[in-house]
Amino acid sequence: MRECISIHIGQAGIQVGNACWELYCLEHGIQADGQMPGDKTIGGGDDAFNTFFSETGAGKHVPRAVFVDLEPTVIDEVRTGTYRQLFHPEQLISGKEDAANNFARGHYTIGKEIVDLCLDRIRKLADNCTGLQGFLVFNAVGGGTGSGLGSLLLERLSVDYGKKSKLGFTVYPSPQVSTSVVEPYNSVLSTHSLLEHTDVAVLLDNEAIYDICRRSLDIERPTYTNLNRLVSQVISSLTASLRFDGALNVDVNEFQTNLVPYPRIHFMLSSYAPVISAEKAYHEQLSVAEITNSAFEPSSMMAKCDPRHGKYMACCLMYRGDVVPKDVNAAVATIKTKRTIQFVDWCPTGFKCGINYQPPSVVPGGDLAKVQRAVCMISNSTSVVEVFSRIDHKFDLMYAKRAFVHWYVGEGMEEGEFSEAREDLAALEKDYEEVGAEFDEGEEGDEGDEY
């Protein structure tokens, strides 16, 4: 088997995790207590969904997941929620005091007390796998636990499981909406280790997803539940090929191979289509070409940056439902002819497509319409650099005055770590600039004539 272990860290990671496991259970027909009436091979078997669920002898399906937080409230919601019987109690790890939005507390003082326990649980899950494929790590980089403990865990996973791939789903701070004053510090410090220790990181941004919910689903005041259900559709589409049998299946390692041209350039944009409410879906024809086009719309991107300001290096389209390769090829050919969607000149093909025949499921009582087909796009675009330069700018404004730095130093960090992380991100911005401008030097003169 090619098992995947999911690790959910901090409030954002856990709440996105709840939405994901709720959706996985629906897709596979697994009940809230872990029983699966449709499963023919009780207590094992080689079903495709066993990549994400392990089975006990009594026919109970247990997610291969760990939830970690430094304070108990969010995890207690899982312990008392609808799916409380789904998870093994040992998989829900919570501490007593939180990281107080402080990277240093999550990474050094409080995080290091809990990290060995987490690794111990992860080791148990890994020993339970026959062919562990890699880890999916869910966290946010603005808070203290997601950023601090998140990067600590990633560093330790690199040591213990060097060759296994690590896919990150990371919530980055939004341009306008801020949840804490020290977000820029936490994000920069945390990205410094994401650069080193994840193989692919998908950037998510609450504001971008808010706007999608408002615009496409007509929800006036979206809640985190609305956002997370949308994010879970993206993550479900990415992992569908691991959990179901399809025509063109895509492995976790394949994302890496197809999307990452240079090891550091591994921050992805994601988008999903169709995001549409039930009232509207009834009246619209959502063909493969249409959903493919809308996945490329700048407004569909789940992070606040405009792909028209950059160039695409590679892009992965995961279709599910009633889709045939012929339609996909036609849709991709159309996209290639569009002037607004520019690829770097050293990557002429740039598309990886996957198809899965399992149609997308929706949570009953949720906002999304049940549709016949959907597409999820993960793309590597140079425009992602906008996310980093925004955070770097805010970091510089605060760090110039050394504002709030004493809270970090007091928890055992050194000022040198701030400047080291900031320099690493400056280098990353430079890397993105160079990647987008590779072979353009000689041709600057001719470009004006084309339009």
Curated annotation (Swiss-Prot):
Species annotation: Eleusine indica
Required cofactor names: Mg(2+)
GO molecular function: GTP binding; hydrolase activity; metal ion binding; structural constituent of cytoskeleton
Domain of life: Eukaryota
Its EC number(s): 3.6.5.-
Protein name (Swiss-Prot/TrEMBL): Tubulin alpha-1 chain
Catalytic activity, as annotated: GTP + H2O = GDP + phosphate + H(+)
Keywords annotated in UniProt: Acetylation, Cytoplasm, Cytoskeleton, GTP-binding, Hydrolase, Magnesium, Metal-binding, Microtubule, Nucleotide-binding
Gene Ontology annotations for the cellular component aspect, listed alphabetically: cytoplasm; microtubule
PTM entry text: Undergoes a tyrosination/detyrosination cycle, the cyclic removal and re-addition of a C-terminal tyrosine residue by the enzymes tubulin tyrosine carboxypeptidase (TTCP) and tubulin tyrosine ligase (TTL), respectively. Acetylation of alpha chains at Lys-40 stabilizes microtubules and affects affinity and processivity of microtubule motors. This modification has a role in multiple cellular functions, ranging from cell motility, cell cycle progression or cell differentiation to intracellular trafficking and signaling.
